[in-house]
Swiss-Prot record:
<feature type="binding site">
    <location>
        <begin position="42"/>
        <end position="49"/>
    </location>
    <ligand>
        <name>ATP</name>
    </ligand>
</feature>
<comment type="subunit">
    <text>Homodimer.</text>
</comment>
<protein>
    <recommendedName>
        <fullName>Macrolide export ATP-binding/permease protein MacB</fullName>
        <ecNumber>7.6.2.-</ecNumber>
    </recommendedName>
</protein>
<dbReference type="GO" id="GO:0022857">
    <property type="term" value="F:transmembrane transporter activity"/>
</dbReference>
<dbReference type="GO" id="GO:0005524">
    <property type="term" value="F:ATP binding"/>
</dbReference>
<feature type="transmembrane region" description="Helical">
    <location>
        <begin position="606"/>
        <end position="626"/>
    </location>
</feature>
<keyword id="KW-0046">Antibiotic resistance</keyword>
<dbReference type="InterPro" id="IPR025857">
    <property type="entry name" value="MacB_PCD"/>
</dbReference>
<keyword id="KW-0547">Nucleotide-binding</keyword>
<dbReference type="Pfam" id="PF00005">
    <property type="entry name" value="ABC_tran"/>
</dbReference>
<comment type="function">
    <text>Non-canonical ABC transporter that contains transmembrane domains (TMD), which form a pore in the inner membrane, and an ATP-binding domain (NBD), which is responsible for energy generation. Confers resistance against macrolides.</text>
</comment>
<keyword id="KW-1133">Transmembrane helix</keyword>
<dbReference type="GO" id="GO:0016887">
    <property type="term" value="F:ATP hydrolysis activity"/>
</dbReference>
<dbReference type="InterPro" id="IPR017871">
    <property type="entry name" value="ABC_transporter-like_CS"/>
</dbReference>
<feature type="transmembrane region" description="Helical">
    <location>
        <begin position="270"/>
        <end position="290"/>
    </location>
</feature>
<dbReference type="InterPro" id="IPR050250">
    <property type="entry name" value="Macrolide_Exporter_MacB"/>
</dbReference>
<feature type="transmembrane region" description="Helical">
    <location>
        <begin position="569"/>
        <end position="589"/>
    </location>
</feature>
Length: 643
């Protein structure tokens, strides 16, 4: 004896409407055998559509048991129900429920995508089905370009795509004229003859008369039923068999659908992209400027030498030192006798006026020693530097910075010429190489260098030193050497700490920390823009889910699992964010290059770019998850009923 394909035992369905329990189905008992053509007929509100939703695994009974091929489906997980719909059921709806963004062939292919069918085989299958239904010339027409009858035939082809062992037709002729309606009924009768089990939902007795068995419903109960006509039916098989969908194929399809959806709402997509683009570009530009400023400052400080100790007069933590007379040349000479010292040099600075012919230049005088080039790591450009002999003989010789040379001599050769320094004659013996700006932004080339003995006697008028700069040999002993100098000077100054020692390595570390803090601040400000862009992505995706609720219902009805819907909307969010991130990287690099061209120091590194793009990608994941989760958890019945 043949067993029923579908069996309902005492099935009831209760809805909670505004706190009031409404029983739509009441104790339904029903058996449907393979190959039957059954019409369930009733007036509006009789419960027939609710019954169809339960039969098609779109809804669950509140009470009772639903058996399919002898196995209970009432307690199956949503994904198991999706598999059952995908492999066993095909739906034909009164309002067609085609996805407007897809053409006829693509609409028919939808169930096969979730069945894991390859691109070629599902395209071939869709074309064969549409051709057999007289739509071979309408493969690439969208629903809006098809008549009602043609749209319903596309819906029938979609129902048959995965085999359609059971065809559930909900008022399939309700929106059609009589001729088109009759054509659809003839198609259903032919499918019944081929072995498909047809369950027709209708309120029209004429339409119901095409079925082999009619079941009448009223007020949620079966009021009349004909006995089933059990006959041998052809076994309907899935054209794709049982297979597991490839993750790569799923991702490819989700990506393709994402781009199609974004293209359909191009203006909105551009606005959403703009938020991510601005955020990513801001991060890259801000970090490039911050790193550029940090490196520029560090380069200038490092140019002075990382092995430098600077000793200045004045109490520790006090400010100002120009009028404090505590350091003398003998202190410098004593320091030179210590271990681990390459050289020590004095520096006395003063603003002076230089003159050559009719050209005047106000500049900075630095009265220093012959060790200047070694300690400052500043090579001579041309000529010679003054020597220890020049210092001992109080020689009136001078070495010019490039800025002073150009101001006084233009393109002429300055070597050997005499200039006036505060009306005292000095001979030019050398010109320094180009140095550029200092850490504080001052022009280091706007300087003249003279022996400290000569400068103290003729120009400054005092022998006290403004500072002593010491070059240390072994950097690993920098701290030890600093302590030795401190002890030496403390002893020489009678135990009074009237001097300050600054370690350039410590200064570089402090500056680096300060600049890193500034860079983080700039990056944080820019990251806020990226956060705002992410909120924009979430907002647009929530709107997209609302607008495409019916599409989601269609996809669930045709076999999409929760993960398929989650993937699709999550990938849409990621595509927007990643595309915005990519454009933002390009624009960020372009703006950084423009800023660099205007003279602002900029430093390019891979990490900020990777970080900014990665943040955009993660932003898409994080802010896209909530809308995607909302889409994946939609009730298919509610989704299909939405407008």
């Amino acid at each position: 004896m043949q067993k029923p394909l579908i069996e309902l035992k005492g099935v009831s369905r209760v809805f909670n409407l505004g706190g009031l329990a409404v029983e739509v189905l009441k104790g339904i008992d029903l058996q449907i055998y393979p190959g039957e053509f059954v019409a369930i007929m009733g007036a509006s509100g009789s419960g027939k559509s609710t019954l169809m939703n339960i039969l098609g695994c779109l809804d669950r009974p509140s009470q009772g048991e639903y058996l399919f091929r002898g196995e209970s489906v009432s307690l199956l997980h949503r994904d198991d129900l999706a598999q059952l719909r995908r492999e066993e059921f095909g739906f034909i709806f009164q309002s067609y429920h085609l996805i407007h963004a897809l053409d006829a062939r693509e609409n028919v292919e939808v169930p096969a995508i979730y069945a894991g069918a390859g691109i070629v085989e599902r395209e071939k299958r869709a074309e064969e089905l549409l051709g057999s239904l007289g739509l071979g010339e309408r493969l690439h027409h969208r629903p809006s370009q098809l008549s009602g009858g043609q749209q319903q035939r596309v819906s029938i082809a979609r129902a048959l795509m995965n085999g359609g062992r059971v065809i559930l037709a909900d008022e399939p002729t309700g929106a059609l004229d009589s001729r088109s309606g009759e054509e659809v009924m003839q198609l259903l009768m032919e499918l019944s003859r081929q072995g498909h089990t047809i369950i027709l939902i209708t309120h029209d007795s004429h339409v119901a008369s095409h079925a082999n068995r009619v079941i009448e419903m009223k007020d949620g109960q079966i009021t009349h039923r004909q006995e089933p006509v059990i006959r041998e039916s052809n076994q309907v098989r899935s054209p794709f068999g049982v297979r597991h969908s490839s993750i790569l194929l799923e991702l490819f399809e989700a990506m393709k659908m994402a781009f199609r959806s974004l293209k359909m709402n191009l203006f909105r997509t551009v606005l959403t992209l703009l938020g991510i683009v601005i955020g990513v570009a801001s991060v890259i530009v801000m970090l490039a400027i911050g790193d550029g400023a940090k490196n520029a400052v560090l380069e200038r400080i490092s140019a002075m030498g990382t092995n430098i100790l600077v000793i200045r007069p004045g109490m520790p933590n006090s400010r100002g030192f120009s009028n404090i007379a505590t350091l003398i040349p003998e202190d410098m000479e004593a320091i030179m006798e210590l271990d681990n010292i390459i050289a020590a040099m004095p520096e006395n600075k003063k603003s002076v006026t230089t003159r050559y012919g009719n050209n005047d230049q106000s500049t900075s005088l630095n009265a220093t020693s012959s060790h200047f080039t070694k300690v400052r790591n500043w090579p001579l450009g041309k000529g010679v530097f003054f020597t220890e002999e020049d210092e001992k003989s109080y020689a009136k010789v001078v070495v010019l910075g490039k800025t002073v040379e150009k101001a006084l001599f233009g393109e002429e050769d300055a070597l050997g010429r005499f200039i006036l320094v505060d009306n005292i004659m000095f001979q030019i013996i050398g010109v320094m190489s180009n140095r550029g700006a200092s850490a504080s932004g001052e022009d280091e080339d706007d300087v003249i260098l003279v022996p400290y003995t000569t400068g103290s006697l003729h120009l400054i008028g005092q022998k006290f030193l403004r500072n002593i700069t010491v070059a240390v040999d072994d950097l690993s002993r920098m701290g030890e050497t600093e302590r030795e100098i401190h002890s030496l000077l403390l002893a020489r100054h009678g135990g009074i700490e009237d001097f300050r020692i600054r370690n350039m390595a410590s200064l570089i570390e402090d500056v680096t920390q300060t600049q890193n803090t500034l860079t983080i601040l700039l990056g944080s400000i820019a990251a806020i823009s990226l956060l705002v862009g992410g909120i924009g992505v979430m907002n647009i995706m929530l709107v997209s889910v609302t607008e495409r609720t019916k599409e989601i219902g269609i996809r669930i009805a045709t076999g999409a699992r929760m993960r398929h819907i989650l993937q699709q909307f999550l990938i849409e969010a990621v595509v927007v964010s990643a595309l915005g991130g990519l454009i933002g990287v390009v624009i960020g690099l372009g703006v950084s290059a423009l800023i660099e061209g205007l003279g602002t120091p900029v430093y390019y590194s891979l990490m900020p770019i990777v970080w900014a793009f990665g943040c955009a990608f993660v932003t898409g994941l994080l802010f896209g998850y909530l809308p995607a989760r909302k889409a994946a958890r939609l009730d298919p019945v509610v989704a299909l009923a939405s407008e």
